[in-house]
Amino acid sequence: RRQRQMCIRDSARWLPNENRRETWEETVNRYVDFMSLKVKGNLPIAQLKDSITNLEVMPSMRALMTAGLALERDNTAGYNCSYLPVDDPKSFDEAMYILLCGTGVGFSVERQFVSELPNVAEEFHETDTVIVVADSKLGWAKAFKELVAMLYHGQVPKWDLSKVRPAGAPLKTFGGRASGPEPLESLFRFTVEVFKNAHGRKLSSIECHDIVCKIAEIVVVGGVRRSALISLSNLSDDRMRAAKSGQWWVDNKQRALSNNSAAYTEKPDVGIFMDEWKALYDSKSGERGIFNRESAQKIVAKNGRRDPEHEFGTNPCSEIILRNREFCNLSEVVIRPTDDEESLKEKVELATILGTFQSTLVNFKYVSSTWRKNCEEER
């Protein structure tokens, strides 16, 4: 019963004409009906519906929530999670757009990535340019992209948020309610200050981390979905090691939005390893965790189905190995005490059908073509 309640809470859409939320059966039907319209050939539709309804197998919960017009408009909304490094100014607005689609973001602020960012201007000047923010996910992301581009050139624009619908207004296509203009105002002001403090140099790892966390903060306010983030950093990065030390929740509340992990690229010596664990203990936050990239590459090579020559990252739950700019295609088998070998084989087959269908959802509207390329190559 609790599982059904959680599924209804997270995935059922509001039916305004009937003044109620979908039932669990209606949610499942909407997903499977969307799937059947997209896939040619014979599918075990009735069996898929029964298995999802009875919580034997599960598709992507994001696809379950958005199946229909929202998912048709942009397939980004069909994926639970993603990963990208902050190696280009576009990383910021891509992360924003993906989070606004309800998809979690793993990101890296390791030095080999943030060192690829351009230098920030030496001086800043107020300009008469006004960024008019359109009232959509695309409008928000484009406006933030424009802001970041101008700040890199030392120009501080004005912005007009008058077209953004008020907080609490219903989002008819995507579901949920609007954040309102206030969180966006806060993000823009925060970003301006971070760039001004970085004048004449590149953004540091902690500055990039804070901008992404602040982006996630505005999505939480919207009530669309609680933003999920994981931030990877170098083992030797003292600033990121201390990101959640002291009273960080007073001066840097945005850091609560991300779990933090050190990316291990080789076996550290005992001294470095113990320093990291001492810092974890002293912080009382349980962070940083460990992401072993070297091990991830070895696992990929051992399985023999994927190209191991990538600097892999991971999703916020750290349950999947992802390329630079790739989405996590998730389907699940729910194992019960009553299962035997045959029933498990049947469940795995059905979950595979769901995952195969979801892998065809590569119509991404805003992000770079690399996302589609990676998803298609690893289908």
Question: For the regions a protein language model found, what residue spans apply to each?
Answer:
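Extended catalytic cores of very large enzyme megasubunits
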Residues: 1-379
